[in-house]
């Protein structure tokens, strides 16, 4: 608990490397004390209603429903500028310490990301949080990021051309975790409907990829992108479900 308190007393929005033109996001996973989920949920809901009731201060809360972190609560602070992290949040942090921390067992620490807009598609920050999010984390080998992103960029370009309806955001870690880490976020509202589809479900995707980017480029780009990912821990996939009462209502 002592280490946890030290972590929380660090300025909530402080980080060293920023770009004024980037769009920043922050995530943190929280574990309530045993048997205190209801108290934790209620305390977070009250804090969110009090301090996070505008678009500029909003938070979304999701609960992990798959993976080793199943059951943890993930707080998401999104669509911020670098300047937003200079705001004085001492009152908000003090409230959290007094009213939420008594029900907290641990947290994983803040992780900050910036959204790579050119590698995202159909992303709209004005949309309400989706009921579900599928999150795929990629850890890329040093010196091989360009190989990974080339395949991603080409796929994004083709999917836009083919009328893909799904929403995808690609985020790069800027502080709080493994370097060279990327997070793919796919919001959706129904398992039955899935994350998206092409306008023509019968399209030969590989053939269209090669038409757009060159003969055999799909095979070569896919191999290069796969080789760029760390072998043992390079890909993790999680799914989370929105907790509306613990999220901002805008």
Please place each PLM-identified region on the residue numbering.
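Bacterial Sec-dependent N-terminal signal peptides
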Residues: 1-21
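Short S/T/G/P-rich N-terminal loop/turn motif that feeds into the first structured element of a domain
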Residues: 16-250
């Amino acid at each position: 608990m002592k280490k946890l308190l030290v972590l929380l007393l660090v300025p909530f929005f402080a980080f060293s490397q920023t770009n004024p033109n980037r769009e920043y996001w922050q995530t943190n996973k929280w574990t309530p004390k045993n048997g205190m989920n209801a108290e934790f949920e209620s305390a977070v809901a009250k804090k969110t209603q009090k301090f996070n009731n505008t678009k500029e201060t909003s938070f979304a809360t999701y609960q992990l429903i798959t993976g080793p972190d199943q059951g943890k609560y993930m707080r998401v602070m999104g669509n911020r500028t670098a300047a937003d992290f200079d705001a004085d949040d001492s009152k908000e942090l003090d409230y959290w310490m007094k009213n939420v921390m008594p029900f907290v067992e641990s947290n994983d620490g803040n992780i900050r990301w910036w959204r790579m807009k050119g590698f995202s598609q159909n992303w709209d920050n004005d949309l309400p949080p989706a009921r579900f999010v599928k999150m795929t984390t990629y850890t890329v080998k040093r010196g091989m990021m360009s190989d990974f992103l080339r395949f991603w960029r080409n796929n994004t370009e083709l999917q836009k051309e083919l009328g893909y309806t799904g929403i995808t955001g690609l985020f790069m870690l800027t502080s709080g975790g493994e370097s060279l880490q990327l997070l793919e976020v796919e919001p959706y509202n129904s398992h039955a409907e899935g994350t998206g589809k092409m306008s023509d479900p019968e399209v030969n995707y590989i053939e269209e990829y090669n038409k757009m980017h060159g003969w055999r480029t799909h095979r070569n780009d896919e191999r290069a992108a796969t080789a760029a990912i760390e072998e043992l821990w390079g890909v993790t996939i999680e799914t989370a479900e929105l907790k509306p009462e613990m999220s901002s209502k805008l």
